Amino acid sequence: MLVAELTSPHQFQVTDVPPVADPEPGQIQVAVKAVGVCGSDLHYFSEGGIGDARCLYPMVLGHEPAGVVVKTGPGVSGWAAGDRAVLEPALYCYHCELCMTGHHNVCANIRFMSMPAEPGFFRELVNLPAQNLLPLPKNLSDAEGALVEPLAVIVHSMHLATPRPGETALVFGAGPIGLLTVAMLKLSGIRRIWSVEPVGARRELARVMGADAVIDPSAADPVHEVLRDTSGRGVDIAIDCAAQRDTINQCLHAARNAGRVVVTGIPAQDHVSLAFHIMRRKELTFYSVRRSNHDSETALRLLESEPKRFAPVLTHQRSLSEIQTAFELCASYSDGVGKMTIRL
């Protein structure tokens, strides 16, 4: 089977390796058909790691997959060869304190496929526990199915942000996560959404996804613009999907008193300095997002019921053999790329 391995910074190698073994009891073997390129994949590609997680080469990335069932292991029911599925990359222990109290996303023993030492989905075949598959509705393409994992992260972030109809929101970053965040905020009834993004094509995509105003941070100070537009009040919710330079602190400055700040993006550096006294004086509620917490089924239902709301983020597709140039395009923000999907 073909597998794409990141062998060093900026370098993929596609090789033919022996196929995976037959699925064990409780497992399903799946032929991977589409995998979205995540911002964290790009961190590994461009920077050799993300935050304090460093690459262990060779490394198989990709954790936003959809595929087709090939065969089932002993004891599996409800699935048959040919069934289309969304695949969940998180492998929880289900018995630690955190799992037992509903915090599966921070499971003490979690294994997340595409992390160092846990191969991801840029490969043709994979065996997964049966509970890690969800049926892919007929009205969704494989590429749309690959949106479930990132959209589930946004659903989780919305549980933290608690958007209410009539409120205002600011979103830093209009990459795929930022774009999906804008769409979910609009769906939640947010009255006005500002999107901050330096890349022109992505600002236009943000408008398509539901942003009411877009700001180029290289041309204007986002905090000044938002405070001016809100007569000094600030926004109810500030969400950082970029975590670049000083965007987290800009969220603190742009949020209203007693507002909510949510950080979905992942900073490249190990330590981030916060304008704590701004946060303290405003009594802001501050959330950091760790993936999703059993939100995939909700995300799938949203995609099934409103595919046109989320589909514009899907701008590019490439084959597995083209993964090198696909990542180079994404890393350079070229050609108006939003979400890149790798086809298998």
Regions found by a protein language model. Name each.
Residues 1-3, 249-253, 293-344:
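C-terminal hydrophobic helical "lid"/dimerization subdomain
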Residues 3-22, 39-71, 86, 107-119:
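N-terminal glycine-rich cofactor-binding segment
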Residues 21-35, 50-97, 134-139:
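Glycine-rich beta-strand-centered segment in the early N-terminal region that forms part
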Residues 84, 140-219, 224:
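Mid-domain Rossmann-like dinucleotide-binding core that forms the NAD(H)/NADP(H) cofactor-binding site
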Residues 93-172:
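NAD(P)H dinucleotide-binding glycine-rich loop of Rossmann-like/cofactor-binding domains
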Residues 161-164, 204-285:
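Glycine-rich cofactor phosphate-binding loops and adjacent beta1-alpha1 units
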Residues 199, 267, 292:
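Residues in the short beta-alpha loop(s) of Rossmann-like NAD(P)-binding domains
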Residues 260-262, 274-313:
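Rossmann-fold dehydrogenase core element
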